[in-house]
Design a protein with these regions (language model features):
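Intrinsic low-complexity/disordered segments
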Residues: 1, 18-20
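Formylglycine-dependent sulfatase
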Residues: 8-9, 20-221
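Bacterial N-terminal signal peptides that target proteins for export
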Residues: 1-9
């Protein structure tokens, strides 16, 4: 008998391929979203425009739908993610630029009151998880002690549970570009209790995603 994950949703904001099992007709589908941060639209092997090799993404394109004439209305990290999460333009969701200490005085961060599709899924009793870069909260003093908060502009910030828009499981950071040794906050970790993975970021995040999906499969069997 086939075993299905029950009402599971995972957002993985990195480039990786993860299988989602088919659902019976009357069941809610399992969902895995994969979001790449500021990925050039033509940096895909299947488009033959750059000397890149992306076999897993090419497979996703061949087995699904590939848009070749689409644009982002604001192609930098925070605004693009804010648009995808909320379905609103930056002027409506308040994320009109990257979240950092320079834009913080202007309220540039995703409001807790914004209604995201992850909130909707949570209301539908999905078990939700987020792994990777979030970058939708403004840093505030005293800044978190990471390398990218020690210069003139602070960038990195913890996201408290009430601002996670329905995500139960959380292994994420604000923004942090040392991908050879990335840092994260776990679900229940307070602001001052982040950890370093000591591993290539995308590899670590895929491992945690597979672990999350496996646990959901076991709990629903």
């Amino acid at each position: 008998m086939k075993q299905h994950l029950k009402n599971t949703f995972l957002l993985l904001p990195i480039a990786a391929s993860l299988p989602v099992q088919a659902q019976d007709k009357n069941e809610s589908p399992n969902l895995v979203f994969i979001m790449a941060d500021q990925w050039r639209g033509d940096a895909l092997g299947c488009l033959d425009k750059e000397p890149v090799q992306t076999p897993h993404l090419d497979q996703l394109a061949s087995e699904g739908v590939l848009f070749t004439n689409a644009v982002s209305c604001y192609p930098v990290s925070s605004p693009a993610r804010g648009i995808l999460m909320s379905g609103m333009y930056p002027m409506n969701n308040k994320v009109i630029g990257n979240c950092n200490s320079d834009t913080a005085p202007y309220g540039v961060e995703l409001p807790e009151t914004a209604r995201c599709w992850s909130d909707v899924l949570k209301d539908k009793n999905y078990r939700t998880g987020y792994i990777g870069k979030w970058h939708l909260d403004s840093p505030y003093k005293p800044y978190v002690d990471t390398y990218n908060n020690r210069g003139e502009t602070a960038w990195n910030e913890w996201c408290p549970p009430e601002r996670r828009h329905g995500f139960d499981f959380w292994v994420a950071y604000g923004t942090y570009d040392n991908h050879l040794n990335p840092m994260y906050w776990e679900t229940a970790a307070p602001r001052d209790s982040f950890f370093y993975a000591h591993k290539w970021g995308p590899e670590y995040e895929v491992d945690r995603a597979i672990e999350f999906l496996s646990e959901q499969k076991k709990s629903s069997s």
